[in-house]
Amino acid sequence: MASTLKLPVGIENFEEIRKLGFYYIDKTRLIEQLLQGWGKVTLFTRPRRFGKTLNMSMLRSFFEKGTDKALFEGLYISGNKELCDEHMGKYPVIFLSFKGVDGLDFTTARRMLCAILKDELDRHYYLKNSDVLTDEDRTLFTKMLHGQDDNIEDSIRMLSKLLYKHYGQKVVILIDEYDVPLDKAFQNGYYKEMVSIIRGLFGQALKTNEFLQFAVLTGCLRVSKESIFTGLNNFEINSIVDIDHDEQFGFTDDEVMKLLLDYDRSERYPDAKEWYDGYHFGNADIYCPWDVINFAKKLVSDQSARPSAFWINSSGNDMVKRFVDKADQTTRDEIEKLVAGGFVEKQLRLDLTYDEIDNTIDNLWSVLFTTGYLTKIGEVKVPDSESYAYKLVIPNKEVREVFILQIQEWFKAVVANDDDTMKLLSKAILDKDEKQITRQLNIVMSRMISILDTKAPDAMKENFYHGLLLGLLRGSNPDWLIKSNRESGDGFSDILIEPEDPDAGIVIEVKYAKEMKELDAACEAAMAQIKNKRYDEALRDEGRCDILAYGIAFCRKRCRVAGEKL
């Protein structure tokens, strides 16, 4: 019988999921791992939409005083009774999410940060009337509550001090999406000012805070320690290359199969794997949870639903765009290899500052890896060095789609800015100059990044070149009427062109050749098909009698052109 539990699309509150009857994949082992592998301050870096916020909400529900212990009944952590007795509901908790800190200028972003801090102060409003606190403490809290204390950098530490005094227990600090303010600041030109505030906040709250039991932070990027974590001792960073906690963010293969079985959709497991699997965190093979939950929800209402790019569409993909735009010829060749299903070997930096990201193409490789657009399938030792390089691949079909989209957008811009080549191409087509057509097409293709999957069937490869040529023709002369796959004669012609001259018409048939030596034969086959299928008939029906026919064959980044007047 299929599960009747609701699927929690977009719900990141652990208590809400548990109380309102949503499906939950148990990640409570993270609690045990954190407490057994003790660290004063732990930073988890994972790509966006990989369950960071839900896990932080789960930690808050477990540790915070007054928690509802029934939330954890039947979950992994409940089996460790000794740990639960010692730690569940034992700590005051400060929980902050910096996800909403945005702004086109520093003043706006600072105001948003203050609002988030105030929301957490409001959550602890009871401190205003605490009998344990002194009058001075309560006055300070009231000032902080009403935004009268401008010392924002000390606000988290001061709140933890007041909580410690009230409860007589050190505080757990949870900071989700710690790096979002830095990302937005870098994009909008106030990075140094934001770094100063975040460094001050963390320095006071995490470094010199005698009232801290432990802290957990999450984010996408591991910002260099020297940037905002200066001087922090006992500071542990857990990233996508680490084995510890490698199954606690994202879904494992077994978890995805069980979810699909629970909803009677196990036959769609291959689709889920092809589109959303492929991430390698530590030693674990991981699926993107945002994708899996969204796909499963679609399947519940429509068993034949096709996979969609849920993760990619949940925010912009500027990093891939910047990468493609910045790529030199060597990098473009490497991108082609990735899109074709291959791997590249790269030494990466996992601790960048945001203002270093665009400094080199190597830094962009690193960011694509840490943000989930690339994943590792192994490591290789760098010759004459003690260092290792990662073997990087595009993780799955969904991410491959975003690379293809950005490559197509980049190529359109390249073509649009090359008026000379486009004019020469259109003139050569009208003049039946096969050599010049070949030359101009080869020039354009030498600049492009191929998005061909080497494992794709020949028909798909032919469609790729068809689409490429169609785009070039539309860019070469905006006054031409160009039709694709239109019925003509005894079939469907690849491309028909109606130039400004009312008597002129052009027929083009596209072929794919596996090897360079097959280009001439492919051109001849294209020309024979045009004649045998009478693809010129639709143009003649329009009164166009001066017809040129072209057979154009492609192999990798080269082409051959045969032409004839019909």
Q: What annotation goes with each model-predicted range?
A:
Residues 10, 61-126:
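P-loop NTPase motor core
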Residues 9-18, 101-104, 108-153, 181-186:
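Conserved P-loop NTPase mechanochemical-coupling segment
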Residues 180, 190-232:
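Sensor-1/coupling segment of RecA-like P-loop NTPase cores
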Residues 1-64, 68-80:
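Walker A/P-loop-proximal flanking segment of P-loop NTPase domains
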Residues 235, 287-534, 559-566:
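Extended alpha-helical interface modules used as scaffolds for assembling large macromolecular complexes
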Residues 225-232, 238-297:
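Amphipathic alpha-helical segments of the small helical/lid subdomains adjacent to P-loop NTPase cores
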Residues 538, 542-566:
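Domain-level recognition of nuclease-like catalytic cores that cleave nucleotide substrates
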Residues 121, 155-166, 193-213, 535-538:
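Substrate-engagement module of ASCE P-loop NTPases
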